Amino acid sequence: MVCVVGGGAAGMVAAWRAASLGHRVVLLEANARLGAKVRISGGGKCNVTHDGSVREVLAAFSPAQGRFLRPSLHAFDNAALRDLLRRGGVDTQARENGRVFPLDRPGSAAAVVAVWEALLQQAGVDLRLGQRVTG
């Protein structure tokens, strides 16, 4: 059993990945819905990733940070994320600065969260909203 605390971007991805690997997963979120900060990121437009190569992305971090991030970025890179969103009905586009956003439309950040919610449900993650964890 894997317990993920927090239903933000990192928590949703961690819960989905663990469930995809065959683990029973419960995700605890204090709010009444998942992805509260994702929904407001980028003014509601939701910068989901960067279009650069893994090498380019890692170059933006210190060597120690890069060593920490490298395995994760190679296991699930920006192209995989964009493909996952596309299959969920959210097309993305890279801007000149390399930032990747859902194609402009009202509620694009909420659409990104909806894709993750569907993935979590399909993977069998036990979602428990309104569950504050203390201690």
Placement of each model-derived feature along the sequence:
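Feature captures the FAD/FMN-dependent oxidoreductase FAD-binding
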Residues: 75-135
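Short, conserved beta-strand segments within well-ordered enzyme catalytic domains
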Residues: 27, 39, 47-49, 126-128
